[in-house]
Amino acid sequence: QGGRNAGSDAEHAAADYLVGVMKDIGLADVEKQAAQCDRWQFNSASLTIDGKDYNVYTYATASTPAEGLTAEVVYVNKGTRQDYEDLDVTGKIVLLDIDQRNDWWITYPMLEAMHQGAVGVLAANVGGFAQIADDALNSQDICGPVGIPTLSIGVADSKEIQKLKAGSVSATMKVDNEVEIDAGTTYNITGVLKGKSSDHQILVGGHYDVHFQGFQDDNCAVGLVLAMANAMVKSGYQPENDIVFCLHGAEEWGSSYTQYDWTVGAWEMINHVHPEWVGKTLAFINFELPA
């Protein structure tokens, strides 16, 4: 299912690959620049009901025990406080509908479920994101604590599980998520097209961490940035000022227990790794969702 999250093995492997590509292009001063982040290593997730495996994907939330957790599934509509009236979900897995564009982020129903005593969350994106098909899954930054295991499930599968609710439905959820606080390193990859002067610079960039396969967000941007760099080098063009091609890590997510958990790689770059870029940088041409 992909996933190249902040500080993960996959993100580090991609960083090494991008360093090689920038060197092959012929950029100068190619560097893999370390920045601090929380680490999210997603290894696996599964959901099984009556011997049937359902396709699921995780958020940057807690793991289950290695053997998984088995509990009754309770449908709670949108998972608001009012939706729990007359329900006891203590020790149970809640199934809920969510529209993260028009209502609220996954953080809120996850925290409410935890407050109500639930041990896990299954969230079906009925609006907003993941609308390309009724089996589409979603992942977002969590903007809060790791909480309890929280999985995205397709709308069609959610409806199927709800139909099973004529009787008690028991599910086994397994989530292997390593979310480690202050224990991660992300890398920002830079290469320079030298200008006539290095007193100032222009940044051209995007981010290379992704949810799933990341075609649109943001692998297309990575390809665009590298293609621009390659074309400029091959043309023999020399700009007036340095052009720094910068590919950031830890953009989608990079920190727990905060609502400011995204763009961590870029924030670390300008605040801690290269604070001297403030005042030196004329422009940052950032590519996001360019497809």
Which residues does each predicted region cover?
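Noncatalytic luminal/extracellular "stalk/propeptide" segments of secretory-pathway proteins
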Residues: 1-93
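A conserved hydrophobic secondary-structure block that centers on an alpha-helix together
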Residues: 81-133
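Solvent-exposed loop/turn segments at secondary-structure junctions
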Residues: 4-6, 36-39, 80-81, 99-103, ...
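Acidic/histidine-rich catalytic neighborhood of metal-dependent amide-processing enzymes
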Residues: 101-102, 106-108, 112, 188, ...
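Sec/Tat-exported extracytoplasmic proteins
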Residues: 1-6, 18, 23-29, 98, ...
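Soluble metallo-hydrolase cores and metallopeptidase-like ectodomains found primarily
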Residues: 52-86, 139-216, 227-240
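Structural recognition of the beta-strand scaffold that forms the well-ordered cores
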Residues: 31-32, 75, 93-97, 120-124, ...
